[in-house]
Amino acid sequence: MSTAAAARPVAGTGLREKTAASLVNSFRLASVTQRLRYHIQDGAKVDPKEFQICCISFAKGIDFAIANNDIPKKVEEFPWLLKQLCRHGTDVYTKTALMVLMISVKHACHLGWFSDSESQELIALADEIRTCFGSSGSTSPGIKSPGSTFSQIMERFYPFVKLGHVLVSFEVKAGYTMLAHDFYISKNMPHSLQEKIRLFVAQTDNIDTSACISNPPEVSFLLNGKGVEKRVNIAMDTGPQLPTNVTAQLKYGTNLLQVMGNFKGNYIIIIAFTGLVVPPEKPVLKDYLQSGVIEASPDSDIIEGPSRVSLSCPISRKRIKLPVKGQLCKHLQCFDFSNYVHINMRNPTWRCPHCNQPVCYPDIRLDQNMAKILKDVEHNAADVIIDAGGTWKVTKNTGETPEPVREIIHDLEDPMSLLNSGPVVFDLTGDDDAELEVFGDNKVEDRKPCMSDAQGQSNNNNTNKHPSNDDYSSIFDISDVIALDPEILSALGNTAPQPHQASNTGTGQQYSNLSQIPMSIDPMPVPVPFSQTPSPRDRPATTSTVFTIPNPSPQYSQVHASPVTPTGTYLGRTTSPRWNQTYQSQAPPMTTPYTSRKVSVPVTSQSPANVSSFVQSQHVPRVLSQPNNYGVRGLTSSHASTSRQHPSGPTVQSVSRLSDLVDVDLTVPDTSNWRPRMRGSLVPGSHSTALDHMIIRPSQQSQTSTRLNSSQPVQTPSVQTSQAQSPFTTAAYRTETVLGNRNHPVPAPPGIVRPTGPTS
C-alpha cells in the first residue's frame, strides 16, 4: 500500500508548469491560424470584427511564446499566412489589428523563428504597416560608452542610478513628432529582482544644469496605450524629474511606446533596467579652492569685515558632518554632503541651498577649512566668526532658546506684553444705556458746526458751557426764534446747585446720588409744523416751550415762558412699562427777583386756520451757560391757553400753572426689578402700552365747524407729558406739551403719515 501511494503521481508534477502552458498556447495558435485561413479563402464571407479578434489572439500567442523563450509547433506555416493577412487590411481598425500582430512577428524574426529571407520580408511588411501610425525614430547605439552624452547626464544628475539592460533607446530631433516604438521583454533577459524598468528622457543640447532632465512641456508619453505618470500633458511635472518607474505598465512580450508632441530641442529617450547604489558615507571629493579672488585695491572704499558662519546645514538645520560647497560658490557657508545627496535623489534640482548656483555631483567640493573648524570647536557651538584673513573664533552661546516675538513692535510698547497677557474678553451683553448715563442719557449727534455756534463760543469765553446733545429740533427744521431774557439766564447761571444734587470741584464735575434710570427716546417722531422759509443761520433750539397754532395773519401770538427752578416737579415718559410712570422730586424753590418775569416769545408761521400743532421740545437753549451746571434741559411753560377764532388767526392765552394742565404723581419709583436692556427695545407685554403713548387717535369731524368768538376761552386741550430724568439732578425738567382738540383733529405735517384705525 505504502509503495503504491508513493508511486501515485501528484497533480501538476507529471508535466512541468512551463511545458503545460506552452502546450496550451500551441493549441490556441493552431485554432486561431485555422480560423484565419478560412477568412482568406476566395469567396469566403469575412466578418471584419471576427477577423480583428483573431489577429489580436494570434499576436498574444506569439508574445507568450517570446516571453517564455519558446517556439510553438508548426511555426513554418506562419510566414505564408502572415503575408496573406497583410493584403486584407482595408479599413483603419483592421490595419490596427494587423500592426499589433506584425510587431509581435518582427520580434519573433529577431529570435530566429524563421529563415533569414522570410524574416526580412516579414520585417519589411511590419515597417510598412507601422508607418501609417508614426515613425520609429533613430536608434542611439553606444549609450553606455564613457564619452557619450547620456553617460555624462547619468554621472552629473543620476550618480547613484545603475543602468542595466537597455530595452529601447532612440533620439528625437526638434519639431512635432509622433513615434511608435515597439520592444519586447523576455524572461531570459539578464536582470535582478531588485532592478526596475525606468524611462529616461533628457535633452542633449545643454547638459550643464538640471533643466536638461525635465520633461518636454508639450510632449506626452504612452506605454501600451496608458499615459506615463507626470509625463502627459494633463498631469505633467515641469521641473527636473527622476527616471520614471514604468515596470507596472509593461508586460513580458511585446510592448509599445508612443511619443507625440512638439519637441523644442534634441532629446534622447531610453527604457532600461536600472538599480540604485547607496551613496558612500566618506566619498572621495576634490578640495575646494577659492576661485576668482580679487586683490584688495588701496583705493577701494569697501573693507571686508568678519563674517558669521553657521555650523548647521541649511538643509536639515543640524550639525554639518562633511562640509561641502559648489565649485563656483563664493560664500563661506557650507552644507552637509549626505543631506545634499539625499534631497537630490528625491528631487534632482542640484542647486546650492545657500546661493542657488548649479552644483551637480562632479562639482561638489570639500571645504577643508570648515572641516578643521568643525573638528576643533565644541559640539554645542552654533556659529563661528571668520575674519578676512582666515582667523576664526567661536561666538558665545548662552544655550537659551530665544522666545518668539512679534515681527512688528510699535514704539513705547513692551515686546513681551502680548505674550504674557491673557485672553482679551469683550462683554457684548452689557447695556449701552448704563455707559451713557455717566455723560447723559442723550444720543450724540454729529453735526457740522455753523457760524452762529462759533460766534456764541467767542462771546462766552469766560463761561464753562455744557450744551445738551439730544437736540432733535433740527430734524423738524424749527427756527430758533425764542428770545430769552438775559437777566433770567444770568440768574440761572449763578444759582448754586443743591447739596443733594451736584457738587463742583476745582478739577472737574463730581456727581452723587445718580439714579440709574435709563431714558429711552420715543421711537416715533411727533409731528411738528415745518417752517417754509428756514433761516440759514438756524441752529438747534433746545427750549421746551408751548408753540402757538400756526397763524396766517401778520399779527404775532404771544407765548410767555418763565424759568423753572433746578429743583421742582418734572415729568417724563418712556416706552418701557416699568418706567412708564411719573416721577417727582421736591426741593425748595429757587428764590430770585426774576422768578415772576415773563419772556415774550414771538412765533410766526404760515398755515391754514383751524390747525393745531404738535411740538416736542426736549432740550435746553445753547445760550444757557452755567459754569458748573450741565444745563437746563427744558423750560416748562407756566402759562398757556388757546382760543379759536375766524380764519384771521387764533391767539393763545397763558396758563397760570403747569399743574392746571397735568396731574403729577408723587410716588417714588421702584428700581428693585430694574435690569439692563437694549436701546429702543420693548419688553414682552409692553408693545400696546408704548403704542398708546405715541398714537394720537383722531376724532370724527363735525359736519359744521363752530365759530368761536375771540374773547371766548377754549377748552383746555389734552396734554401729553413725558418725563426725562437726567443722571445729573441739577438738570431742569423736560416736558412735552401737545395741544389739540378732539372735535377738530390736527392734520399731519408733510412727511408724517397719520395712523388709521377706529376712533374712540
UniProtKB/Swiss-Prot annotation:
CDD domains: SP-RING_PIAS-like. Expressed in leaves, stems and flowers, and, at low levels, in siliques and old leaves. It is found in: Nucleus. Disruption phenotype: No obvious growth difference under standard greenhouse conditions. Altered sulfur metabolism. Reduced growth in high osmotic pressure (mannitol) and in response to abscisic acid (ABA), but enhanced growth and fitness in high salt (NaCl) condition. Abnormal steady state levels of SUMO conjugates in various conditions. Lost ability to form a high molecular mass complex with PIAL1 and MOM1. Released transcriptional silencing of target genes (e.g. InterPro entries: Znf_MIZ, Znf_RING/FYVE/PHD. Residues 492-518, 631-653, 699-729 have a biased composition (Polar residues). PANTHER family: TONALLI, ISOFORM E, ZINC FINGER MIZ DOMAIN-CONTAINING PROTEIN. Homodimer. Interacts with MOM1 and PIAL1 to form a high molecular mass complex which mediates transcriptional silencing at heterochromatin regions. This is E4 SUMO-protein ligase PIAL2. It comes from Arabidopsis thaliana. The gene is PIAL2.
